UniProtKB/Swiss-Prot annotation:
Pfam families referenced in this protein's UniProt entry, alphabetically: PIN
Required cofactor(s): Mg(2+)
Domain PINc, first and last residues per copy: 2-129
Leading EC class: hydrolase
Encoding gene per record: vapC7
Family indicated by similarity: Belongs to the PINc/VapC protein family.
Protein name per UniProt: Ribonuclease VapC7
Role, per record: Toxic component of a type II toxin-antitoxin (TA) system. An RNase. The cognate antitoxin is VapB7.
Keywords from the UniProt entry: Hydrolase, Magnesium, Metal-binding, Nuclease, Toxin-antitoxin system
Biological classification of the source: Bacteria, Bacillati, Actinomycetota, Actinomycetes, Mycobacteriales
InterPro entries attached to this UniProt entry: PIN-like_dom_sf (IPR029060), PIN_dom (IPR002716), PINc/VapC_TA (IPR052106), VapC_family (IPR022907)
Species assigned in the record: Mycobacterium tuberculosis (strain CDC 1551 / Oshkosh)
Single GO MF annotation: RNA nuclease activity
Length: 145
């Protein structure tokens, strides 16, 4: 199972960008159940927030609703244990924002095979495999198409 960061969802549903097609491929693979994935309520909230800055609220909420079942049904972490681990990561990893530290803690606690994100701050973590959602990253996750 992989864990998705907001960047994957934003690029998959956003405007032209070098990461858009690889992120779309990954989201499609998740929807087709070719790869198991999870994320957090915070990631969905951030995605909806970013989307609502460029589109109307109904569009943003609809995409959030579509994304939730595909990415949230596979893992439900202990909020207390994950938050404690996330706060430790936040405290000890200067480049990591608080919300990203909690996401990394979810990935580590879930035994995820990868945390997929365009954010380079995740590369500084030793207990989470960070995969950039570019063409090479998608080959590592989905194999060569």
């Amino acid at each position: 199972m992989i864990v998705l960061d907001t960047t994957v969802l934003v690029y998959a549903k956003g405007a032209e960008h070098p990461l858009r097609d690889p992120c779309r491929d990954l989201v499609a693979a998740i929807a087709d159940e070719r790869i198991a994935a999870t994320t957090t309520a915070e990631v969905i909230q951030e995605f909806v927030h970013v989307r609502a800055r460029r589109r109307d609220r109904s569009d943003a909420a609809a995409l959030g609703r579509v994304t939730m079942p595909n990415c949230s049904r596979r893992y439900s972490p202990s909020i207390e244990a994950t938050s404690k681990r996330g706060l430790t990561l936040f405290e000890t990893t200067p480049g990591l924002e608080a919300c990203d530290a909690v996401l990394a803690a979810v990935a580590a606690s879930a035994g995820a095979t990868a945390l997929v994100s365009a954010d380079p701050a995740f590369a500084d973590l030793s207990d989470v495999v960070h995969v950039i959602p570019d063409a090479a990253g998608m080959v590592s996750l989905l194999g060569d198409r």
